[in-house]
Structure formats: C-alpha cells, structure tokens
Amino acid sequence: MTPQKSDACSDPVYTVGDYLLDRLAELGVSEIFGVPGDYNLQFLDHIVAHPTIRWVGSANELNAGYAADGYGRLRGMSAVVTTFGVGELSVTNAIAGSYAEHVPVVHIVGGPTKDAQGTRRALHHSLGDGDFEHFLRISREITCAQANLMPATAGREIDRVLSEVREQKRPGYILLSSDVARFPTEPPAAPLPRYPGGTSPRALSLFTKAAIELIADHQLTVLADLLVHRLQAVKELEALLAADVVPHATLMWGKSLLDESSPNFLGIYAGAASAERVRAAIEGAPVLVTAGVVFTNMVSGFFSQRIDPARTIDIGQYQSSVADQVFAPLEMSAALQALATILTGRGISSPPVVPPPAEPPPAMPARDEPLTQQMVWDRVCSALTPGNVVLADQGTSFYGMADHRLPQGVTFIGQPLWGSIGYTLPAAVGAAVAHPDRRTVLLIGDGAAQLTVQELGTFSREGLSPVIVVVNNDGYTVERAIHGETAPYNDIVSWNWTELPSALGVTNHLAFRAQTYGQLDDALTVAAARRDRMVLVEVVLPRLEIPRLLGQLVGSMAPQ
C-alpha cells in the first residue's frame, strides 16, 4: 500500500515523532502495529504520512502486541503504538512475552501533553492521582530500556532506547507525550551507532586454547537453541556444522533454526522426553557444544536433561565456558567462529552420522477414518513447502508439530516459555505482514483461538492468504491432560468455525470442516492450490487425545 500524506502532516516542520519513525525505518521497520487513542492520534498522522512506514491497525492492543512480536521475530525489529494507561496496560502481556522470548519490540505510548501532566489533574486513562509515571514504572520490569521523552533530549533518548533494544533483543518503552511528538527537531545526522565489539582478545585466546584441549580428536556434537537466531549468529553456527561431520539437534524452542532435512540432524532434544536416539547422542557425546541454549521446563522434559558440564562447551550471548571454566567478554559469533577454525585446522574427519533404522512408511489411513492427532500432524507436515512460516500455538499444535521434521526453508514459531495461548493468531498477522511473499500456516486450538480471533479480519484487510488449521477438541485439552479431565472450567462454548471468517469481515476465503482423514486431505489439497485466499480448516479431534511428546511431558510433570 502507498502511504498517503494526511492533512495533519502538511506542515513541513520536522518533529520528534518524525525522528523516531526515521530511526525505526533505519532499523528495518516498514509497518507499525497498534490501536488509535486520543493521546496518539496526531503521531499516527505522521506514521500515515511517512514515506516508508505503513500503519497496520489491530482489533485490540493485546493482539497488536502479539502481531508486533511475530513481525519482530522475522524482521529483527518491530514497533507497536498504544495510548496512555488503558492501551498500554492491555498490551503488557504481549510485551512481557516478547521480553521472555528475546524479541525486539519498541512499545510507543502516546501520552497527555507535558502541560496537562503538570496540572496533576485527574485526566482520563490515568489513575486520577496526578502521577503520570505509574505505567512507566511498570514497564521497567518487562523492557530493557525506557524513556519519558522531553523536547531537549528526545533524539538522544530515542537513540539510547533503540540501541538497547537492538543490542539486547528485548522490548523497549517510549512514552511520547502528544506535544513532545510535535516538537521541532533535526533529523538524525548519522546512522544509529552500534556498540563496539564485546569480545576481549585475551578471553577469545584462552577460550580457544581450552576448547582445543577438550575437543582433541573427538567428534563434536552440537545442541542449538533460539538465542543463536535472536543474536544473528546462524551463519557462524552453520559454518561450524560444515567444518566437519557434526551431529546436531535443537530444543523445541529453536525448532527450524537448522536444516532438519540434513543427514546430520538428529532431531529435537527434550531431556527424558526425547526420542532415545536423540537423547543418547546428546547426553553421551564425547564433547557437546550448547549454543544459545536455555533450558525451560516445557522444552527440557521438566529439567530432565542430563548434560555433563565436564564435557560441554557452552556458548552464550556475552560469555562462553569450557568444562565450566568461564571466558568473558566473548560474543557468541566469535566463539562459534573459533570452534569452526579448530575443526578445520585439526586435519581429521569424523565418521558419518549413523542414520536411524529404516521404518516402513505408515499405512495410509482410510478416507473415512476419524481423525487422530497423529493423522493431523502427519498430513499438515506433508503439506508444508520451503518458505512456509509455521506458527503453532502452545498446546497440542506445538507439541504435535515438534516431533515432525520440517522441510528445508520452513520457519517455525512457537512461544514455549511465555506460553500465552492465543498468541499465534495475531503473531501470524505480524509474520505475514513481515514476509508477504512467504505463505503463513497457523496451527491453533479452539480454546486458544477464541482469545484472539478478531484478527481474522485483519488478514483479509491486509490482503493476506494464510492457511489456518483450527483444532476443535472441544475445550482446553492440555489442561484436561494435566488436571480436571471432566472439570467444567476446561469446557468452552462451541463455535461455528467455518462461518466465523465471514462474520469477521473476511471477504476472500474458503472454509472446511474435517472429521475424517479424507476430508482433511481434500481441504489441505485445496489450500495448497489456492494461494490467493485465506483457507480455514477446522479439524475435529477427540477431546482427550494428545500428541506423544506432550503425553510424555505431562507424565513427568510435577506441581510447578
């Protein structure tokens, strides 16, 4: 869409709001998500008038925050705009999730004018006590940098917050009073400066020496996780894997970080819930490199990992360790490059990875056979093609797909640490806006979708054509598996899912209800052929059936 200059922005004066937008554009932001409110309306005029940034409105602030998160995971930076008080508190859950999962999101809050705040009167959207920094203080717990912009220092403060967001890969908060947004200023004089390299030559040298001694002539095994992606060290990791025959795996959090079609890819490591071949290879490795790994309860089989520190090289954001000896400051990319150099320089080749025993292909289900979890995820996975962006909500969708190998070039997004159900539907909007050339595939349960379903209309308005699989298992199946199998609090109202897109303003779509394998197969075949429109497939599953991996996790679960 081509931005149209608004009447409110016909004044040629360059403002603080323009400065903020130009810095965001410099960092790769071409869309901003949010919800209008009277304290941010004039700033929104500047967004609409900006030559390279486009406004994408959401149905509510929570969904806008989720959309910004999905966008930020693919673009490396994103922004969401809300109004003071009521708007910013509504997006807090999404911002906290971005903080937990290392997603760079800039939260811009339109606030009352400085003069109005100075009166300490009971303004709308405030708590009525004359204190207008309550919510700024709340934001300090879930953002890496905050600023309450003042005219004289606005540019410097914007640069500080954006630099921290870029460096730490976590959200930042900017309180932009409506009069400060309009205040005249000068455009940026130079690109946003980058922090100097954070690697000490001495730390790198000592790390390399210790790694050489530990590795010796052993074959290296690698376990990688999402921080490699967030810290933009994927190329360095791939170079390490190409330096020798290196068996490797990821956690569920880092699924699709590496090419899962590679013969050296072992699978997903989840502690005691892992497939035995994967568990044995990771836990029995002579030397294991853990790159960007964060063990959380839901991706480690409730902390059942058995990793021997004496045989482990751990690569973190700013420090690394060899057999528990810490070396810092040492950036992840530098440590990975050092390991690749060690492997290429030692002049030996490790043996090939032994492939798993060949298993006969599963029998094709009969077309009239009722759907099961295994059938659904097998068929969904077979429908994926390179370039797809797959978002799986935290439930049977996430754990059903975690067990399946993805085609090369597929990006997988979940939220296993924060685990806010409903997240993926608006996040899919953000992902699709970030890369409209890549088809988005959304996998979500009925209970989760009921929380954020309004954004179906946003897909349509933005001209996006996702494939949406809604798992209708009649309520909160994961919760039923954990506790309260027949409890009324795990029940939800049954919706007519195939009629919902029309009710929410979707004008170009197809909708199917699949109860049998044949119906699912037909629906996904049509979805693959019709890339010009949204395709929603409701799949009906038994209310108590869960995927294998989720069953193992639930079985090992203790009260947390």
Curated annotation (Swiss-Prot):
Its cofactor is a metal cation; thiamine diphosphate. GO terms for molecular function: magnesium ion binding; pyruvate decarboxylase activity; thiamine pyrophosphate binding. Keywords: Allosteric enzyme, Decarboxylase, Lyase, Magnesium, Metal-binding, Thiamine pyrophosphate. Gene3D superfamilies: 3.40.50.970, TPP-binding domain. It is an enzyme of class 4 (lyase). One of its GO terms (biological process) is aromatic amino acid family catabolic process to alcohol via Ehrlich pathway. Mg(2+) binds at D446, N473, G475. Thiamine diphosphate binds at E61. Residues 396-478 are annotated as: Thiamine pyrophosphate binding. Binds 1 metal ion per subunit. Binds 1 thiamine pyrophosphate per subunit. Its EC number is 4.1.1.-. Disulfide bonds: none annotated. It holds the Pfam family TPP_enzyme_M. The keyword Metal-binding applies. GO terms for cellular component: cytosol. Decarboxylates branched-chain and aromatic alpha-keto acids to aldehydes. Belongs to the TPP enzyme family. This is Alpha-keto-acid decarboxylase. The gene is kdc.
